[in-house]
Amino acid sequence: MPEDYKIISDTVQDGVRHITAVPSALVCSRQIDFDLVDGTIRNLRYTGGCHGNLQALGALLEGQPVSFALERLSGINCKARGTSCSDQLTRVLRAVL
């Protein structure tokens, strides 16, 4: 099954890897931006979607290892769509590892 997200930018500057992705059209968010620093998630931001919930997700994942997000967020389903904004993040994380 082909992936339904698209990584539009993956750059490294001063040891910080910055990733920008467009999630599946099935979810409400339109873009995911985050940094990876030494295997941890930093500066997670979503454009669009449920603003409060996605801000909370960013705050909860700040400084957490990628494995933390993968273990807890993979497969979360929103409104029977087969994916969610948090699940889309885990799909992108797997792709860039």
Regions found by a protein language model. Give the residues of each.
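Structured beta-strand/loop patches that form or line metal/cofactor-binding pockets in enzymes
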Residues: 2-37
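Active-site- and interface-proximal helix/loop "cap" or "latch" segments in soluble metabolic
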Residues: 23-31, 35-97
